[in-house]
Design a protein with these regions (language model features):
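General beta-strand structural signal in soluble alpha/beta enzymes
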Residues: 8, 28-31, 49, 64-65, ...
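Long, charged alpha-helical interface segments
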Residues: 128, 133-210
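N-terminal beta-strand-loop-alpha-helix module at the start
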Residues: 1-57
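Short, acidic/small-residue loops that bind anionic groups at enzyme active sites
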Residues: 113-129
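Short phosphate-binding loop-to-helix
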Residues: 63-85
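Short Gly/Thr/Asp-enriched flexible loops that form oxyanion-binding sites at enzyme active sites
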Residues: 101-112
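A glycine-rich helix N-cap at a beta->alpha junction
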Residues: 62-68, 118-122, 147-152, 157-158
């Protein structure tokens, strides 16, 4: 049985993202992410951070105060903690967008770290979902109201790429990080199936601009 957790990072989210939180999920708020917990009416099970982007909250929730000088971001620390405690299905909210692009890139790296360690990981905001494609694990995605399906290599080369159920199918293809071959594909079936044999990929589902 999967152990589910939600990481709340600092980018403000809308209440629409409540749909990604299930009863019983372990909720970790990272630094200013505790404000997202308040927006979503969630009670964090754990708060972590160095509190450089928001004051440390006065709360009875378990809190781990991190040093300002450290290698891990607050979100990366939360990812380490959850992995060490056996969580294998993790959703990151408040991790995309915001004023600092480098934080989004750092959170994508954190997601990759989790995926490479066997976690089923999802990053989501109001317009998109991001999933990781790793060797040996077929990714089956539901069409729902998604318009675009894009695939990007995360580690230089993505090999043995197969995409089915999309307008631009691929079979045993090689993708490289310096050529965006996989951008703006579209569903042609109720589900799309993606596989790879080497490297790691990032799959982005996006709703229509209209």
């Amino acid at each position: 049985m999967s152990r589910r957790a939600v990481i709340l990072s600092a980018v403000p989210v809308s209440t629409a993202l409540c749909r990604y939180v299930q009863p019983g999920d372990f909720v970790v708020a990272c630094d200013a992410g505790y404000r997202n917990a308040e927006r979503l009416d969630l009670r964090p099970d754990l708060i972590v951070g160095d509190f450089d982007s928001a004051p440390q909250p006065k709360t009875e929730h378990e809190t781990i105060v991190l040093p300002h000088v450290k290698d891990d971001t607050d979100t990366q620390y939360a990812a380490h903690w959850l992995l060490e405690h056996g969580y294998d299905e993790i959703t990151l909210l408040g991790a995309l967008g915001g004023a600092r692009l480098e934080h989004t890139l750092a959170n994508l790296a954190t997601g990759l770290y989790l995926a490479k360690n066997g976690v089923n990981v999802l990053l989501a905001n109001e317009r998109s979902e991001l999933w990781y494609l790793v060797p040996g694990r077929e990714l089956i995605l539901q069409r729902r109201d998604w318009k675009y399906l894009s695939l990007f290599p995360m580690e230089g080369r993505l090999t043995g790429v197969c995409i089915r159920g999309a307008f631009y199918p691929l079979e045993n293809a090689v993708m490289t990080a310096d050529y965006p071959l996989g951008v703006s594909n579209e569903f042609i079936a109720d589900t799309a199936q993606l596989q790879c044999s080497g490297g790691c990929g990032l799959v982005v589902l996006t709703r229509d601009d209209a």
